[in-house]
Amino acid sequence: MSLSKQPVIVIVGPTAVGKTKTGIELAKKLNGEIISGDSVQVYKQMDIGSAKVTQEEMEGIPHHLLDLVDPDDEMSVARFQTLARTAIDEIAAKGKLPIIVGGTGLYIRAILYDYQFTVQAENKVLREELEQFAQAEGATALHDRLRQLDAKRADEIHPNNIQRVVRAIEVAMSGQTQVSGSEPSLYDSLLFVLHMEDREQLYDRIDQRVDLMIEQGLVAEVDRLVAAGYRDTKAMQAIGYKEIVPVLEGAPLEPAVEQLKRNTRRFAKRQLTWFRHQFDGNWIEMGRLSFEENFKIIYDRTVGFLKAVKSE
């Protein structure tokens, strides 16, 4: 597999900020294909709760890394990295532009940077990096990294127990070696971080999205997954699913929906914190201007970037 300096566009941001629509519009105008950078959308049958793009929303644009595995088949960062890089090569071989769109920052960094994986469950270099990260950013930030990898394990370990959190990350990453943020990307990548300065505006959009999920049949989707035997899988610990399971067991729906909204808002806040620390990109404020105006900014910067890459 080639890791030459292939141009890649990356669109990240918190949930409900407009990544999907932005990516599709960009792909339509620039002959691109989408690679999903989401750790839940890789699972089959988990559509509504993961806000997976629908066939209608795709508008004919090919999407990669959706519906890859069943909910009882765990997706590791290493496996995702391999699949995503293969997709980039395949898209580029067709003369098209790879566009990565998603909110799982760790997965996206693993695609772009020289993360190495070994079969070891313990890795001294990784452990030292994680301990330094905890000292610099705090125990909560470290715990958030574990949550991105293994939400269930994160629930079992107190954030202040740094040693256990570090060890859990080591195990979850199967010896992944971290790189510093100053390392160059393996690709000629242009990265956009979509966000909203007005948190209440973003939170309102999140609440509306959750209400729409309920209308679209989220409870029935979770019911089907539980009936299929997936109740206790790691995938079902994802936000959007774990909150609904108690409803199937007799708990009232309204408090569960409110809990889902709260959890999603907290997750969006953690995503933004992570992006600030881990990504040096173009931050696009999506709340003040119209979508069309914001898209023009993104499109113009992308065209300029591609021209510059071509002239090198």
Swiss-Prot record:
Binding positions (substrate): 15-20
One MF annotation (Gene Ontology) recorded for this entry: ATP binding
Record-level GO BP terms: tRNA modification
Keyword terms of this UniProt record: ATP-binding, Magnesium, Nucleotide-binding, Transferase, tRNA processing
Required cofactor names: Mg(2+)
Domain of life: Bacteria
InterPro entries reported for this sequence: Dimethylallyltransferase (IPR039657), IPT (IPR018022), P-loop_NTPase (IPR027417)
SUPFAM superfamilies for this protein: P-loop containing nucleoside triphosphate hydrolases
Enzyme class at the top of the EC tree: transferase
Site feature location: Interaction with substrate tRNA: 104, 127
EC nos: 2.5.1.75
This protein's record includes keyword Transport: no
Gene3D superfamilies: 1.10.20.140, P-loop containing nucleotide triphosphate hydrolases
NCBIfam families xref list: miaA
Sequence similarity: Belongs to the IPP transferase family.
Complex formation: Monomer.
Stated role: Catalyzes the transfer of a dimethylallyl group onto the adenine at position 37 in tRNAs that read codons beginning with uridine, leading to the formation of N6-(dimethylallyl)adenosine (i(6)A).
PANTHER family: TRNA DIMETHYLALLYLTRANSFERASE
Name used for this protein in its record: tRNA dimethylallyltransferase
